[in-house]
Amino acid sequence: MAKLDFDRSKEHVNIGTIGHVDHGKTTLTAAIATVLAKKGLSEAKSYDAIDNAPEEKARGITINTSHIEYNTEKRHYAHVDCPGHADYIKNMITGAAQMDGSILVVAATDGAMPQTKEHVLLAKQVGVPKMVVFLNKCDMIKPEDAEMIDLVEMEVRELLTKYGFDGDNTPFVRGSALQALQGKPEYEENILELMNAVDTWIETPVKDFEKPFLMAVEDVFTISGRGTVATGRVERGRLSLNEEVEIVGLKPTKKTVVTGIEMFRKNLKEAQAGDNAGLLLRGVERSAIERGQVLAKPGSIVPHAEFEAAIYALTKEEGGRHTPFFVNYKPQFYFRTTDVTGGLEFEKGREFVQPGENVNLKVKLIAPIAVEEGTKFSIREGGRTVGYGSVTKILK
């Protein structure tokens, strides 16, 4: 485990880049780290260092979610670079779930594309409160075509408003991530302008410190001689070293003790809401815990398989189904970090749900997971999101 202590003197905010494939999300992430490094606030990162999974290179599309950290004068940021390709939206959902705000990257040469819309919708669905927009590749627009950038901005503002964001007041910054990464001063200035907008527009999240501890498990690995480590984002509460937690969902609930806490390879005495932490668990076999479970304060949350929910079925244009679904439909329900198959029961008199409809229905999962009223989820089939919802009432 790590040896350094983690600095809590600055506000900590989780953000990430979202947007259409090849619009420049990873280049922008590298540019932010590199420009801030010149001010001594970050470590410079190359594009390749962020775009780091081997399978990404083969296809030239980002698959895994990369985590980097940097500072502005005001804050410490943990930044996730989210995958852009539709096939990898499942990863995007786990990535977007870790955002207190996001930077939407839109190429001025293209404007809003299908995945731009899908990511804005997903951001809303997973509870990202605000975003800042970076209009990228502005260096590729000829001066005489400058009004094209204005049109793209108008279009994206309308899109934000449509999906429930503040389209009128959201800050837009124009620039070129590639030129900034290559050290062109006027484009580096745009990156500082962008980070200033992020510092001011994206609010420091109200940390849920007072609520009982809960962390969704994203990944599990073994440290030889030490034991099993579960990683994820602390959704709420605080956890001190040597405190008890329960492993909840999918399997029978099990108690354990947390004997180590780390964040960005630095040791912590406690983990708190908003942290991306690794927890060392006493006496837990690697096979006894899996992605999709949660670690929670004992007794604070119990697993459920049946609940009522309000759902929205995406339209064909939003990437949803082209046809209605009927009562025998058995999609996957994506909660926090995992898919669980479930069946549906419609309200009396309803025979099907059309794309674009908002309905209330009952869900029965094949395995119980940690849910409560207000828990958000998405409905997926064959690797694509076809709807989303919120738990309105626990049944059993």
UniProtKB/Swiss-Prot annotation:
Protein residues bound to GTP: 19-26, 81-85, 136-139
Species the sequence originates in: Mycoplasmopsis agalactiae (strain NCTC 10123 / CIP 59.7 / PG2)
Region spans: G2: 60-64
Region (G3): 81-84
Keyword line: Cytoplasm, Elongation factor, GTP-binding, Hydrolase, Magnesium, Metal-binding, Nucleotide-binding, Protein biosynthesis
A GO CC annotation given for this chain: cytosol
EC id: 3.6.5.3
Protein name: Elongation factor Tu
Gene3D superfamilies: P-loop containing nucleotide triphosphate hydrolases, Translation factors
UniProt gene name: tuf
